[in-house]
Swiss-Prot record:
Low complexity bias spans: 112-125
Biased composition (Basic residues): 74-96
Protein family per UniProt: Belongs to the DEAD box helicase family. DDX5/DBP2 subfamily.
Catalytic function, reaction form: ATP + H2O = ADP + phosphate + H(+)
Origin superkingdom: Eukaryota
Keyword Flavoprotein: no
GO cellular component: nucleolus; preribosome, large subunit precursor
Motif extent (DEAD box): 303-306
Region feature (Disordered): 31-125
UniProt-recorded name of the protein: ATP-dependent RNA helicase DBP3
GO MF annotation, one: ATP hydrolysis activity
Coiled-coil annotated spans: none
């Protein structure tokens, strides 16, 4: 091989090797570029997808935000509307209440079809004036009549013209009670009446007979025309029971409305009611719910008005009265005492009322037919002493003696109830820890004689008419002397005699002076042990502001002071 041939071969091989290497590198480069391009594309796709997801999330968030804002706007709009309606409703009520206070309240209109056209019977006219004066004097009755109509008291049932349905219900009684005798002529004449008399004086029939008689006479059995408000559920049920007795077979529908039970059944019954007996709290609830219309009520009764004010129902009473018809309403108020708050309430909502007072009710006094026994003992001996008293007053199942025991608080009542049951006494109880059904059942058992012992707190101290209670035992003295008088008033009712036995301890010594005054006023003996506590009387405290509350006459205008 020549040199030139070898050179050529070398050049050829070098060129071939270089070309292959170059192609290989080129292929690698292309592959690399393709891989990079693919990765780049995947990255772009991934990024684009991620961006799309971000956009979707952002759109979703934005949508949710818009929906949330829309809901908020709707809610704000609804709240604003409700607030406006509530404000308008409140304004209307305030305006109505203001109008009722500023404008005089007119009594029920006297038309020819109404029983308010009262005519004195010939039998009553034939009674001599000396007999009338003797009746008023013997029963310590005073009548304050702004119109000086001088209507005579009805001394017997045959001296008043009532419907046969009412007369038949009264046949089991001998004669009207003093409060009934004096108030009926004014109520049947359509006048506003204030009755101030002790509990158990027949006040329910005093206002119930004219009310039911008027409904029957006018035939107005399609509307709610009579409303009676009472402070407690127990008293409301008692009034209801008495009115049911009057309305039996008369076509008049009576309904009781009170708390502690479902509203639904009460709302259903109200629709066909002519007479409603209610506690203030539940009635205001029904008014606010729009479940009851008082627009046609023309006969309004505030029973135990002083007790309702003591329990803080003044604003509720004003709300209720403002929802009745001022132009046609006849308003009645019955109360055991005549304090300043009750007088102001009467001045605001009654039109020239006739005030009938039985007994000296301006000063707190106890029923003189009640024998009051006060024992000063050690507070740790109460349970032992209670057992002795129950045996003394023959509190066994075979006895007819009904005994009412008062405890101060519901926990004490519950403890004493269990204590008596352990000692084999059959006892019923009414206090705050029991349901309304349990309290009603206990009261029914006591009234029927199924149980001759009833243990109660002060929820039963006012208004309850439990016949034939022979003895009241004050296991723990009440917080006020007024409550003491109301407690012992559960016995000695309707002309009967009774006994009140009180256990007094050193813890109650601040009330010893007031208790001594009550005992002296009723001609009862004052024990020496009670006198040892001294004759001081604790200042009566305001229910909200305490003992240092200054009683200011809010009706007086403020004095304007000018500074030079």
């Amino acid at each position: 091989m020549s040199f030139s041939s070898g050179k050529f071969l070398f050049v050829f091989l070098f060129f071939f090797f270089f070309k292959n290497t170059s192609c290989s590198n080129q292929r690698k480069y292309i592959t690399k570029q393709q891989t990079m391009s693919k990765d780049k594309k995947e990255h772009k796709d991934k990024k684009r997808k991620h961006d799309n997801e971000d956009v979707e999330i952002a759109d979703s968030k934005k949508q949710r935000k818009l929906e949330k804002q829309e809901k908020k706007d709707k809610k704000d709009k609804k709240d604003k509307k409700e607030k406006k309606e509530k404000k308008e409703k409140k304004h209307k009520k305030e305006k109505k209440h203001k109008d009722s206070e500023s404008s005089p309240v007119e009594p029920a209109a006297n038309d020819s079809s109404s029983s308010t056209n009262y005519t004195q019977s010939s039998k009553l006219s034939s009674v001599s004036q000396s007999d009338i004066d003797k009746f008023l004097s013997d029963n310590e009755i005073t009548v304050e009549d702004p119109s000086s109509s001088s209507l005579r008291p009805i001394l017997s049932f045959d001296q008043v013209q009532l419907t046969s349905a009412i007369t038949s219900k009264l046949s089991k009684f001998d004669k009207p009670t003093p409060i009934q005798s004096v108030s009926w002529p004014f109520l049947l004449s359509g006048k506003d009446v204030i009755g101030v008399a002790e509990t158990g004086s027949g006040k329910t029939f005093a206002f119930g007979v004219p009310a039911i008689n008027n409904i029957i006479t006018t035939g107005n059995t399609k509307t709610l025309s009579v409303l009676c408000i009472s402070p407690t559920r127990e008293l409301a049920l008692q009034i209801y029971d008495n009115l049911i007795e009057l309305t039996a077979d008369s076509g008049v529908n009576c309904v009781a409305v009170y708390g502690g039970v479902s509203k639904d059944d009460q709302i259903r019954k109200i629709k066909t009611a002519n007479v409603v007996v209610a506690t203030p709290g539940r009635l205001v609830d029904l008014i606010n719910d729009g479940a009851i219309n008082l627009g046609k009520v023309n006969y309004l009764v505030l029973d135990e008005a002083d007790r309702m004010l003591e329990k803080g129902f003044e604003e509720d009473i004003k709300t209720i009265i403002s929802n009745t018809s001022n132009s046609e309403r006849q308003t009645l108020m019955f109360t055991a005492t005549w304090p300043k708050e009750v007088r102001e309430l009467a001045n605001n909502f009654m039109n020239s009322p006739v005030k009938v007072t039985v007994g000296d009710r301006d000063e707190l006094s106890a029923n003189k037919r009640i024998t009051q026994v006060v024992e000063v003992i050690n507070k740790f001996d109460k349970e032992k002493k209670l057992i002795q008293l129950l045996r003394k007053y023959n509190a066994n199942e075979s006895s007819d003696n009904k005994i009412l025991i008062f405890a101060l608080y519901k926990k004490e009542a519950s403890r004493i109830e269990n204590f008596l049951k352990r000692n084999r006494f059959s006892v019923a109880a009414i206090h705050g820890d029991l349901s309304q059904q349990q309290r009603t059942a206990a009261l029914s058992a006591f009234k029927s004689g199924q149980s001759n012992l009833l243990l109660a707190t002060d929820v039963a101290a006012r208004g309850l008419d439990i016949p034939n209670v022979k003895v009241v035992i004050n296991l723990t003295f009440p917080l006020t002397i007024e409550d003491y008088v109301h407690r012992i008033g559960r016995t000695g009712r309707a002309g009967a005699k009774g006994t009140a036995h009180t256990l007094f301890t050193e813890d109650e010594k601040h009330l010893s002076g007031a208790l001594c005054n009550i005992l002296r006023g009723a001609n009862q003996p004052v024990p020496e042990e009670l006198l040892k506590f001294g004759g001081h009387t604790k200042k009566k405290a305001h229910s909200v502001y305490g003992a240092f509350y200054k009683d200011v006459d809010m009706t007086k205008t403020a004095k304007k002071i000018k500074f030079d």
